[in-house]
Design a protein with these regions (language model features):
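Metal-dependent nuclease catalytic cores that hydrolyze phosphodiester bonds in DNA/RNA
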Residues: 1-55, 62-69, 175
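A residue-level signal for conserved active-site and pocket-lining positions in enzyme catalytic cores
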Residues: 8, 92, 179
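Non-catalytic, well-ordered alpha-helical scaffold segments
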Residues: 9, 87-90, 173-174
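Metal-dependent nuclease catalytic regions and adjoining charged, substrate-binding loops involved
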Residues: 68, 79-81, 95-193
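Short, charged, amphipathic alpha-helix that recurs within catalytic cores of restriction-modification
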Residues: 73-95
């Protein structure tokens, strides 16, 4: 997370140097969702003379993520958002009673910056993602136990000379590999180096 924090500081300095009006950088926020008071801290609010104030999230990204996910825009992220960036952005915006502006994304290898703008008409998305967040909070706060983890492992597949070869091994779902609770869901998993 240190790289991400440093990237956020650099972006804020660049915005200030470019005379872009900002407010509430790294401000605490809270929202009652799913019957719980969920707290966080948003990255920044940009005050655009045309669009007004909107909540933006700053992301540091690998070159792959920068070019293959964020560069394709908001709609592409809706199709594949394993880390919940859309839920996160709409939660921060809702906590301030504002629209979600989108992401300011920095390629942490090259330093390139891109703005990935959320659509102006976002009420349907807002409702959808706030609903997903409420469901997740309610599930986490209940006394449920998994009959099986919510995300299932994937078959390991190698491609050799254009032919797919399945090894018979299972791999954790991509979302699970980054999760701090993976050992709870997958206590018998073995990590090979």
């Amino acid at each position: 997370f240190l790289i991400g924090d440093l990237v956020e500081c650099a972006v804020m300095a660049i915005l200030k140097g470019a005379d872009i009006k900002t407010s509430d950088a790294q401000s605490k926020c809270a929202l009652n969702i799913g019957g719980e008071n969920v707290k966080g801290s948003l990255d920044i609010i940009l005050d655009d003379p045309v669009d007004g104030k909107k909540v933006w999230d700053i992301k540091s990204a690998s070159p792959y993520s920068y070019n293959m996910k964020f560069a394709k825009g908001y709609e592409a992220l809706k199709e594949d958002d394993p880390f919940g960036y859309l839920v996160q952005g709409h939660l921060y915006a809702e906590s301030k009673g504002m629209d979600f502006g989108g992401w300011i994304v920095v390629d942490k290898s090259s330093g390139e910056i891109q703005f990935v703008k959320a659509p102006d008409d976002q009420e349907e998305d807002r409702e959808k993602y706030l609903g997903k967040a409420a469901e997740a909070v309610e599930a986490l706060m209940s006394n449920f136990t998994f009959k099986k983890p919510p995300l299932q492992p994937e078959d390991e597949c190698l491609t050799v000379k254009g032919e797919k070869i399945y090894t018979g091994n299972k791999l954790l779902n991509k979302q699970c590999t980054f999760c701090g609770y993976k050992k709870y869901c997958w206590p018998k998993a073995i990590q090979y180096d």
